[in-house]
Curated annotation (Swiss-Prot):
This is Ribosomal RNA large subunit methyltransferase F. Specifically methylates the adenine in position 1618 of 23S rRNA. Residues 10-20 have a biased composition (Basic residues). Keywords: Cytoplasm, Methyltransferase, rRNA processing, S-adenosyl-L-methionine, Transferase. The gene is rlmF. Belongs to the methyltransferase superfamily. METTL16/RlmF family. The keyword NADP does not apply. The keyword Membrane does not apply. It comes from the Bacteria. It catalyses: adenosine(1618) in 23S rRNA + S-adenosyl-L-methionine = N(6)-methyladenosine(1618) in 23S rRNA + S-adenosyl-L-homocysteine + H(+). It is found in: Cytoplasm.
């Protein structure tokens, strides 16, 4: 089998300079108005949130959000992102107003994901699956979300944005039940989504992918931390960063208030499987890559978010050992946060072309 590995690249949507050893691309930076900072410095060009949040529209869609909206230092409406109730209300309003998702909610203590960053992943996946440069929409695309969580954010956004079909898996029955409740309130989502409980946490694809199934792509946002203590430290660090930003904008007193009022276990919370696992992100990725080899002919692209760039090198080494045919790293930036998508395939370019022609 011929192996053609693409080293790390930065995704973009204009011309890309290529060299024999590296494919690089950049998302064009968004211009920033001096008196109105954007939500992100480099969201995907198709991201609906490039210009930040339209709170007037969001409040019309969900009036309850108004209770959490206050002017930010620039005089524009915003919320306290250290307040878990405010963040959840914002998410529900965004999903209803922009993506027409009714009844989104999560149980207390479960992970509340930022919508702009999550939908960015899907936009880059759409580019990865594009045929002759054209994004494929509709039910011919089948995605598998590994560890969908109680929020079910990837299948919900993928269905509403691109019309894809999804299977969403999780080891937590509460998460599966909660996503089912959301789906029941949305006819299109019900028709495009299957939920599957993983009975064996050590397995990622086994028990989920049936022998006769094919998926165009798998998605995953793996647990980052290796222990509960490490996860708690990470949550506290996020709170301190928020407080530091508050201090820069409002002074020392505001920082003290932010730290004293913040509750990291809530806003930056999540259940065990959402936040940590033995060996952390690196071990989870290694397990996923090893197990993906058994489903090499049933999945066109395996993908995962990788939060820590240091975890990429061992992934590349393992994929080389397992004879992956193609490997891509798509870098993303949301505000000051950099992350990346690792994508790999065991199928040759010829099979990739054939796969596209066999889609219904």
């Amino acid at each position: 089998m011929t192996r053609s590995t693409t080293p790390p690249m930065r995704a973009k949507h204009s011309s890309a300079k290529r060299s024999p050893s590296r494919s690089a691309a950049k998302v064009n930076p968004v211009s920033v108005k001096p008196n109105k900072p954007l939500l992100s410095k480099a969201l995907h060009p198709r991201n609906a949130h490039l210009q930040g949040y339209d709170f007037a529209t969001l409040i019309i869609a969900m009036p309850a959000l108004a209770a959490f909206v206050r002017p930010n230092p620039y005089g524009n409406p915003s919320i306290d992102f250290a307040d878990p109730k405010a963040v959840k209300s914002l998410n529900a309003a965004l999903l209803l107003s922009e993506y027409h998702i009714n009844g989104w909610d999560i149980p207390e203590g479960y992970l509340c994901p930022p919508v702009p960053g999550r939908v960015d992943y899907l936009h880059y996946i759409a580019d990865l699956l594009a045929v002759k440069g054209k994004v494929v929409k509709g039910a011919s695309i089948r995605g598998l979300d590994i560890g969908t969580g109680a929020n079910g954010i990837y299948p919900l956004l993928g269905i509403q944005t691109y019309g894809w079909q999804f299977v969403a898996s999780d080891i937590d029955p509460v998460s599966i039940d909660n996503v089912a409740k959301i789906a029941q309130q949305n006819e299109k989502i019900t028709a495009h989504l299957q939920l599957r409980l993983q009975p064996q946490p050590e397995h990622i694809f086994k028990n989920i992918i049936a022998a006769d199934e094919r998926f165009d792509v798998t998605l995953c946002n793996p647990p980052f931390h290796s222990s509960l203590a490490e996860a708690s430290e990470g949550s506290l660090r996020k709170v301190k960063n928020l407080a530091k930003n508050q201090q820069q904008k409002h002074g020392q007193q505001s920082r003290k208030l932010a730290v004293s009022q913040a509750k990291p276990t809530l806003n930056f919370g999540g259940q065990k499987a959402e936040l940590w696992c033995q060996g952390g992100e690196q071990q989870f990725l290694a397990n996923m890559i090893k197990q993906s080899r058994d489903y090499a002919n049933q999945v066109l692209w395996f993908t995962s978010l990788v939060s820590k760039s240091d975890n990429l090198k061992p992934c590349y080494q393992l994929l080389k050992q397992l004879n992956a045919v193609e490997v891509k790293t798509i870098e993303m930036t949301q505000g000051n946060k950099a992350t990346r998508i690792l994508a790999w395939s065991f199928l040759t370019p010829a099979i990739h072309q054939q796969w596209a022609t066999l889609r219904p």
